UniProtKB/Swiss-Prot annotation:
PROSITE patterns per the UniProt record, alphabetical: CYCLOTIDE (PS51052), CYCLOTIDE_BRACELET (PS60008)
Key words, A-Z: Disulfide bond, Plant defense
The name this protein goes by in its record: Cyclotide pali-A
Similarity remark: Belongs to the cyclotide family. Bracelet subfamily.
Matching InterPro entries: Cyclotide, Cyclotide_bracelet_CS, Cyclotide_sf
Entry PTM: This is a cyclic peptide.
GO biological process, one term: defense response
The protein's role, per its UniProt record: Probably participates in a plant defense mechanism.
Cross-link (Cyclopeptide (Gly-Asn)): 1-31
This protein's domain notes: The presence of a 'disulfide through disulfide knot' structurally defines this protein as a knottin.
Residue ranges of the TM segments: none
Length: 31
């Protein structure tokens, strides 16, 4: 929840979600 993964999730889910990133405020974050 604090480290940006450099990916947005406005239209599609976080591809980086495979690495543990989650969508928050249309941006993918790690932890």
């Amino acid at each position: 929840g604090s480290i940006p993964c450099g990916e947005s999730c406005v239209f599609i889910p976080c591809i980086s979600g495979l690495a543990g990133c989650s969508c928050k405020n249309r941006v993918c974050y790690l932890n």
